A protein has these predicted regions:
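Divalent cation-coordinating acidic motifs and surrounding scaffolds
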Residues: 1-254
């Protein structure tokens, strides 16, 4: 699970979230791995990974060396080992783009992919985040001309046309999950935006107090079928982009 737009400079919100997850959740224990605060101005954000420590382990991570200063918030790349014979490791590359520089940042994201896959010699990579890749920030023509669209091997799991915004007045596919690697893509069972206002019976305003985006997720099958029967959901890896769940309670965003 990857959280974005975390602006907590006191470093108190994530420990609180972990404490509550491990207190009430029955699928833990959970651990976290965070970047530094990133940004060009006084407003800064961090990327935060949350993961089940008995199912995954951080093998390595690094902040992308953005020598040309193309990213407002350069990706914090992480390589996980997984307790799965089907998918023993996975690289995640999160990015929250700036609306005015979406095209430049998303094309530069391809270079981050090359850097990460070359560093760890893997093709199983997921690029994910609030790409702002729709509506006024990026036209369909410019979207289709991105390197991540024209280069073979990438599957945009959150399809064009999927609304990832909470407001009824908007219908934009800002948030994306992009899978690279034939093997990884073969494990994909589903992808969706999670309409949490509907699931939790919230009004639009109540939902906006939490986030103006829906979380997006992919479902990966991490166990082989036995006698033709697919494994249950517990044998899958869920990756969610939360922007940001429980924000009002935990102070994850301003």
């Amino acid at each position: 699970m990857v959280l974005q737009e975390v602006v907590d400079s006191s470093d108190s919100a994530i420990p609180l979230l972990l404490r509550e997850l491990n207190r009430f959740g029955d699928s833990g224990p959970y651990a976290s791995h965070s970047s530094l605060l990133l940004g060009r101005s006084t407003y800064k954000e961090k990327y935060v990974y949350l993961y089940r420590s008995h199912e995954a382990e951080v093998q390595d991570s690094y902040m992308y060396d953005d020598q040309d200063d193309l990213f407002t918030r350069e990706p914090f790349v992480c390589w996980f080992s997984l307790r799965s014979k089907v998918l023993p490791s996975l690289v995640l590359v999160p990015l929250h783009t700036t609306p005015k520089a979406v095209e430049m940042e998303l094309n530069a994201l391809y270079d981050v992919f090359l850097d990460a896959s070359g560093r760890w010699q893997t093709k199983d990579v997921i690029l994910l985040g609030d790409f702002n890749a729709d509506c006024a920030s990026l036209t369909k023509k410019r979207l289709d001309n991105l390197v991540l669209r024209t280069q073979a091997g990438f599957h945009w799991a959150i399809a064009d046309g999927v609304d990832t915004t909470v407001r009824a007045s908007t219908h934009c596919t800002y948030d994306r999950i992009v899978l690279h690697g034939e093997h990884l893509q073969s494990l994909l069972r589903g992808a969706a935006a999670f309409d949490f206002p509907q699931s939790f019976g919230l009004t639009e305003q109540e939902a906006l107090n939490i986030s103006d985006h829906y979380p997006v997720e992919v479902d990966l099958v991490l166990s082989r079928a036995v006698h033709g029967v697919q494994p249950p959901c517990l044998a899958t890896l869920w990756l969610s982009l939360l922007l940001p769940l429980l924000a009002s309670q935990l102070g994850l965003v301003a």
